[in-house]
């Protein structure tokens, strides 16, 4: 098995990192998936990555049909439309990985195309998006982690390794991918959400016992849910229990979204934990408050509270 026809769905911070790395290979057919006005914009303006303009091949889902390997790197609220694109692209041999945040995107995708097409994965890249520009440090980026649910190395995980070889991408295969995914989810919930509510840099976690307490409350609820689902987060590699190195002023993706007046992925973070908590009978008061607080900040950004 060799992956030669590669399709990337999503050209934001994560998609740009993947495109940057794979564009260094000259023996693959690499494309970004887009349609309509967005397709025209990318073809005209390109992708501005670390102050360099890349002009990707842009294909519609129909044009990319039969791809060997599909990499999903969209925001959570774009997943439903991305799934429709995936359904158009996938055929019998196609392998799909999702590099989205959260713990349920693989399930959503597999429900539409079948679990046999999906290799669970995650990514850790400390990136910043400003307008149409994406910045990241390739050297400090932890990168892509992938593996089969049963922990066995397979023909398709070895094909992923061969694809990533010779690029600037950082990657590794793991035999405990579900623990790794939940470990990253734990980091995202603990690091993204308290600072997003406050609008401050990550240094606040070490400088304020009160912010640290909020983070602890959010994470304890997540830990209880993971335990109830049989996920042992402690099995994750040490690199999955920490984020990429950042400065105290750093603002993670949820706060970056609010700063730019974009809607966030709070449905995927606290929203998912609230849903799972209800299913399992586990209270989630910290996540419920955080969910409503960030939703209210989105409404504020939308201009809903501009009273005269």
Which residues are covered by each model-predicted region?
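A structural signal for isolated positions on well-ordered beta-strands in alpha/beta enzyme cores
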Residues: 7, 29-31, 97, 145, ...
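Residues at the C-termini of beta-strands that transition into short coil/loop
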Residues: 34-36, 61-62, 100, 122, ...
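NAD(P)+-binding Rossmann beta1-loop-alpha1 motif at the extreme N-terminus of oxidoreductases
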Residues: 1-55
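Rossmann-like NAD(P)(H) cofactor-binding subdomain of soluble oxidoreductases
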Residues: 50-134
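NAD(P)-dependent Rossmann-like dehydrogenase/reductase catalytic/cofactor-binding core
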Residues: 2, 216-308
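Internal alpha-helical scaffold of NAD(P)-dependent oxidoreductase catalytic cores
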Residues: 4, 41, 88-89, 112-117, ...
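Short, charged/polar "capping" segments at the starts of alpha-helices
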Residues: 38-43, 106-107, 154
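Short, well-ordered alpha-helices that flank and scaffold nucleotide-derived cofactor binding pockets
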Residues: 20-24, 84-88, 111, 271, ...
């Amino acid at each position: 098995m060799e992956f030669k026809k590669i399709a990337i769905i999503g050209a934001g911070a994560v998609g740009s990192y993947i495109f940057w790395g794979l564009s260094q290979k000259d023996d693959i057919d690499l494309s970004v998936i887009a349609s309509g006005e967005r397709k025209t914009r990318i073809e005209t303006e390109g992708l501005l990555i670390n102050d360099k303009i890349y002009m990707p091949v842009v294909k519609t889902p129909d044009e990319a049909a039969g791809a060997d390997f599909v990499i999903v790197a969209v925001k959570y609220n774009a997943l439903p439309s991305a799934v429709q694109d995936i359904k158009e692209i996938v055929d019998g041999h196609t392998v799909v990985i999702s590099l989205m945040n959260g713990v349920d995107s693989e399930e959503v995708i597999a429900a539409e195309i079948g679990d046999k097409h999906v290799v669970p994965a995650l990514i850790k890249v400390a990136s910043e998006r400003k307008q149409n520009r994406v910045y990241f440090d390739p050297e400090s980026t932890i990168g892509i982690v992938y593996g089969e649910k049963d922990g066995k190395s397979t023909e398709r995980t070895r094909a992923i390794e061969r694809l990533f070889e010779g690029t600037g991408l950082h990657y590794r295969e793991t035999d405990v991918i579900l623990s790794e995914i939940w470990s990253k989810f734990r980091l995202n919930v603990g690091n993204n959400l308290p600072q997003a509510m406050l609008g401050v840099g990550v240094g606040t976690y070490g400088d304020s016992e009160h912010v640290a307490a909020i983070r602890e409350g959010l994470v304890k609820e997540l830990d209880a849910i993971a335990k109830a689902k049989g996920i042992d987060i402690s099995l994750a590699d040490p690199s999955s229990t920490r984020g990429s190195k950042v400065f105290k002023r750093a603002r993670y993706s949820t706060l970056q979204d609010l700063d730019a007046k974009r809607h966030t992925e709070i449905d995927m973070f606290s929203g998912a934990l609230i849903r799972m908590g209800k299913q399992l009978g586990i209270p989630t008061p910290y996540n419920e408050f955080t969910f409503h607080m960030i939703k209210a900040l989105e409404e504020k950004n939308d201009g809903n509270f501009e009273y005269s």
